[in-house]
A protein has these predicted regions:
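AAA+/SF3 P-loop NTPase mechanochemical coupling elements
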Residues: 162-165, 201-219
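Short glycine-/polar-rich loops that comprise or flank the Walker A/P-loop
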Residues: 168-170, 195, 213-216, 230-235
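Conserved AAA+/SF3 P-loop NTPase catalytic/coupling segment centered on the Walker-B
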Residues: 171-192, 224-233
């Protein structure tokens, strides 16, 4: 009781008279750039500005937090970094060169983005076939930015575990993601942009625990797993290629090679980060998207490395369009409507008030027609509307996306509600 009393007094005193100190994990803002905590026992930091990068041992006023699972980054190799340093990393990434450069740009962006209120993290979404080395790829990314004792994680079953992981890391990697529900998709968006998770306080009926969450994310999976356009909009999609059986090397051997190469690779990344900071004030995105700060980083990478203006930005924008389209088309209503429209000119089953390019009926008639498609597969899908009213609401949400697929939806009100499906050829 006396110990608790003393703790309470100390807490009260610090709340009223103590100084507020801003602390950071792994990456912190500083004048003209960032400082990166190497996590070593000598408390050394890497300071990156537009003038270059350097190791700081003493004199930094930046306060870093360290958690038990944090592991140290090695000291980068001495000297000025070059493109050859970055090329050392390519042998560990089974991707095409454009994807490789986009990943390098993502690494730089994450290293230059501390957890502050205004920052937004782009989610690295790896899509891979079996045998592409996606887990090793993910592990190496963590070892370059934010190594921890936990490493790659499986997605937890409760929000509290998600919050704890986010609070004690700069980057969290989730392995073998599958079809993500809307709840999980929204949660991942919240992690990337920053927010607050709530949970019931232990041993109480109405107490609430608040967990501030903000973290960079790496997701990987074999199948298409991003199904919400809002999540897709925040991602950098990267496809990994299968490794030929004749080219396979044991993971332990690859990791040994990587640990030898890591100081040189980090030197190259820190140098590129400095070059990006130098270029940022003079660039403007040619293909701005929702995550516009990442577009600016891509523009700065183009300027720093002599890549034709807009090359990386255009590729990023194109990939976003593809992943968003895949996400929209995975919606069961969207999928059913596309199938319905494709079959309409040829299938007498839909001859009710229709011609070759148009169908008109009530919402109930459309619900029945869509539900009967493909062996009634849609009707038994839990995500498919169970009433005509719900279907009408979903169609209004999907109206613009359907139009992009050449399907126009018109809503008419007379004595009865009517929906016209028109195919624009």
């Amino acid at each position: 009781d006396q110990i608790n009393f003393l703790f309470n007094r100390m807490e009260s005193y610090s709340a009223h008279f103590g100084e507020n100190i801003h602390s950071f994990y792994r990456v912190a803002p500083c004048e003209g750039g960032v400082e990166i905590d190497l996590g070593s026992s000598d408390l050394s930091h890497v300071k990156i500005t537009a003038e270059g990068w350097s190791i700081v041992y003493r004199g930094s006023g930046t306060k870093f937090l360290r958690f038990k699972n944090m592991q140290a980054l090695p000291l980068p190799a001495e000297g000025k970094g070059s493109i050859d340093d970055l090329n050392l990393l390519k042998k560990y990434f089974n991707t095409d060169w454009t994807s490789f450069i986009l990943v390098i740009a993502w690494i730089v962006y994450i290293m230059l983005t501390p957890k502050i209120h205004s920052s937004n993290f782009v989610i690295l979404a790896l899509n891979a076939v079996a045998g592409s080395g996606k887990s090793l790829f993910t592990k190496i990314l963590l070892l370059l930015i934010d190594p921890t004792a936990v490493g790659i994680r499986t997605f937890p079953q409760n929000k509290k575990a998600v919050g704890i992981a986010a609070k004690s890391s700069h980057v969290v990697a989730y392995d073998n993601m599958r079809r993500l529900s809307k709840f999980i998709s929204d949660l991942l968006c919240q992690l990337a942009t920053g927010g607050v998770l709530t949970d019931r306080k232990l041993y109480t009926d109405d107490g609430e625990t608040l967990i501030n969450v903000h973290v960079a994310l790496i997701l990987n999976g074999i199948h298409h797993y991003i199904e919400e356009p809002d999540l897709a909009d925040r991602c950098l999609p990267i496809n990994l290629e299968a490794i030929n059986s004749t080219d396979r090397i044991p993971e332990s051997e690859l990791l040994n090679q990587f640990h030898n190469d890591r100081p040189v690779i980090l030197r190259g990344i820190y140098q590129l980060a400095s070059d990006v900071l130098k270029a940022l004030p003079s660039v403007n995105p040619t293909h701005p998207v929702r995550m516009v700060e990442f577009s600016r980083t891509l523009a700065a990478v183009e300027a720093a490395k002599g890549i034709p203006v807009g090359t990386l930005q255009e590729e990023y924008a194109r990939r976003l369009q593809d992943i968003k389209r895949d996400a929209v088309l995975s919606d069961p209503v969207m999928e059913a409507m596309v199938e319905f429209a494709n079959r309409l000119p040829y299938d007498s089953e839909f001859s009710l008030r229709s011609d070759a390019t148009e169908w008109t009926g009530t919402p109930t008639e459309l619900l029945v027609a869509l539900g009967d498609l493909n062996g009634k597969r849609y009707r038994y899908n839990k995500q498919f509307p169970d009433s005509a009213i719900s279907l009408s609401k979903r169609l209004r949400v999907l109206e613009k996306d359907l139009l992009k697929e050449g399907i126009e939806v018109l809503f008419k009100r007379s004595k009865v509600r009517l929906i016209t499906i028109r195919i624009n050829t």
